[in-house]
Every structure is written in C-alpha cells, then in structure tokens.
C-alpha cells in the first residue's frame, strides 16, 4: 500500500540551495545551524538519488539513513531479571 521510504542526510555548503533539494524527494527537516537537510525518497531510488546529490556543487557529503534496517521491536525483561536482589528504597 505505502512505498518503502528511506531517509537521506545531505550536508550543504550553504542553505541558499535548500529549495533545490525538493526535486529529489520530500524534505523533512533543514538545520540552519549545522547546515544539513533530511529528505525522504523511495528505497528503490536511494542509490540513484545519492549519486545525483553528491555531484551537485553545493553539497558537501551525502549519507543514507539506516533506520529501515534497524530492529525497532524490543523485548521486555523476563520475570527473573525484573526481581533485583538489591531492593531500591
């Protein structure tokens, strides 16, 4: 139903060119102080978009976001681990 998306972090020399990043994907955030932008595009196009972005003169470097590849479901502690031998308080 929804396409798989991946974030791309783009480090810029100047924020003046931030609007030009719109044609490469959806801009999620632009940091004025650190001069970077986070944009999202389809996972199938990530390599192609990263190569295009890296070739632009106002881009310092381009990094992919590894969030889609991380396990985000965490397990709760077992009953044995919950009971601490040292009481608190």
Curated annotation (Swiss-Prot):
Instruction: Please verify whether the record's keywords include Cytoplasm.
Output: yes
**What are its GO cellular component terms?**
cytoplasm
Locations listed in the record: Cytoplasm
InterPro entries listed in its UniProt record: DUF2129
Q: Which UniProt keywords apply?
A: Cytoplasm
NCBIfam families, per database record = PRK02886.1
Q: Which family does it belong to?
A: Belongs to the UPF0298 family.
Question: Which protein are we looking at?
Answer: UPF0298 protein GK1096
